[in-house]
Amino acid sequence: MSNGATAQVLTAADVIRLLDLKPHPEGGHFRETFRDTRLVEDNRAASTAIHFLLARGERSHWHRIDAVEMWHWHAGAPLELEISQNEGRIECITLGNDLASGQRPQAVVPAHAWQAAQTLGDWTLCGCTVAPGFEFKHFELAPQGWSP
């Protein structure tokens, strides 16, 4: 039985291969792991979930969606998550397992808020849960270099 320590010896490429992750348009790699069969307005899944990995040098570029997104830290280095609800003030949350230093295992991005993220080490594996479910037609990627 593993105690989780082996996760630190894996490389980003190992995790991408083991979880069958694919490149994401915002940056990083992902794979959808859950799509609720319950449907809500517009024939949309009630919720969805993905694995999401950012490696050193990758960034989840500024983007927003029309639904609430919950980030869950799973493994690797801490992750810096930036959120802007008013295109000016940026809130920075560090996701990770060092609770005493202020890191948190999860964070919520409100619907329509801008968000961006980057790993603070070699790689970070997170989960993202979206409700109502994620649809690319409700995804807006900011121009490269843009910041609120």
Q: Where in this protein do the model-derived segments appear?
A:
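Non-catalytic, conserved peripheral segments adjacent to functional cores
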Residues: S2-V108, A116-A117, G121-T124, C128-P148
